Amino acid sequence: MRAPFSRTLIDLICEQSERYPQQPAVIDERGSWTYPQLRDRCLELASALRAAGIGRGDQVGLLVNNRAEWIEICVAVSALGAVAAPFSTWSTPRELDFLLRDSAARILITLDRLGERDYAAEFSSLFADTDRRPPALEQLVVVGESCPVGGKAYETWLASAPAFELPPPGERARPDDTAFILYTSGSTAHPKAVPNIHGAVIENGFHIGERQGLSPVDRVMLPVPLFWSYGAANAMCATFSHGSTLVLQGRFEPGPALDLIERHRCTSIYTLPAITHALISHPDFAPARTRSLRTAMTIGTPQDVATVAQVLGAREVCNVYGQTESYGNCCVTWHHWPLERRMAVQGPPLPGVRLRVIDPESGRELQAGEVGAIEVSGYLTPGYIGASATQNAEAFTADRYFRTGDLGSLTPEGDLIFKARTSEMIKRAGINVAPADIEDVLRQHPSVAAAGVTSAPDPLKGEIIVAYIVPARDTQATPESLRSHCRALAAAYKTPDRF
């Protein structure tokens, strides 16, 4: 289909509002919003942000799960030339402190609570303590029913905003401005800050949607977090650039996910091997419940791809390869290819992407069939920022290729075949985990003198986390105490599976 003309998120939503005035843009577990309704909400929020002093180049912290507010916040900031900085809702207070300081967010928009986490109480305490509060952070806005002293209730805040008209192009975001900063786990103890640029993320997202065969009739199910590039840079931009509908699940649970797919007749799903397994293993799963699925996006082994097509029922599933630095995906198979080909390769580079495989020792570019280090250029982050900016020289070549840390080869047809990871990263159930991060947490346990973390293959999760420790003198560390310690200081998915 024809690509949209717009190259910023706010302009894209405004354009699609004119093209598809009756089309739902977002559905979450509470309701549905058409493209014009989403546009109006974004402009209302932009007015509130401007009244709060937010302008060009300012960072807006975002701690919200998959719901319509996440989308409208991410889009609205671009009306002012500001930048969204989404944070993982799995982050511990210690990790959030780093994210707030590194992003220099001037305002934080957060959920009141999610599961057992009471974010409102956590941030109320933080704002009351000027010694602990990050220096750039000035304001707190809370999404939900409870709002602490010192914070502003999101809906009340929006309702009190003055009337707002979209600023002229020179005042709002430009195509070469940063749309959002995504934090991704890396080989260092802290996550890396990865800017994604408006024009590039929309263009790359459009090409991803083309590989899936998306159109305005499609409804795209998203059970994975929007704060991942797989969600924000990939699913959101692929969906909105095609006038399709994004169906959000606030927190993945297989039973409710099956309900959403069936109720809204979703035609595409962004999945991972662990999610696929959870869906098809659920006692309420039946092929009839997912018969609306046509296509999907997944990573994994050839069998993982086949399972999505043949068991889950998304017969035109796309096999993919990419990372946050390349806007979610840089290679995607075509949905209409024979399944055997989609199982065997991760597809050709997307338009505008250049990919090469080199000998990691000599730097020589390799021929088809030769296995070497994968490097990517084209639609690519301009570089890490914040504390991780020191990693740029190591991560990017002089001619602006990104060193992915992966091994692979190219077929004579130009398709990428991913072989293995060369970096130290552990990919547990599709989530990147840095060993250094876990080692740092383990070393803070009073019974640990030294710690090392590695991975082991696992048929369900791909890799699991294995930790080795040297006990401190005259102490005894039990696996139970170590797990409790890790869960207290780091997100739950970083807790080692085996000691």
Residue ranges and their predicted role:
Residues Q22, V141-V142, K152, A159-Y183, ...:
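Conserved pre-ATP/AMP-binding loop-to-beta segment of ANL
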Residues D58-Q59, N65-A85, T89-P93, F98, ...:
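A short helix-loop-beta submotif of the ANL/AMP-binding
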Residues A51-A52, A82-T156, R473-T475:
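Structural core segment of the AMP-binding/adenylate-forming
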Residues R2-S6, I10, C14, Q22-R67, ...:
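Conserved AMP-binding/adenylate-forming core of the ANL superfamily
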Residues I202-R219, F227-S268, A278, H282:
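Conserved AMP-binding/adenylation subdomain of ANL enzymes
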Residues T34-P36, R172, A179-E203:
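Conserved AMP-binding A3 loop
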Residues S91-F98, L108-T110, L355, A373-G378, ...:
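AMP-binding/adenylate-forming catalytic core of the ANL superfamily
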Residues L158-A159, R263-T271, I280-M343, R354:
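Gly/Ser/Thr-rich phosphate-binding loop
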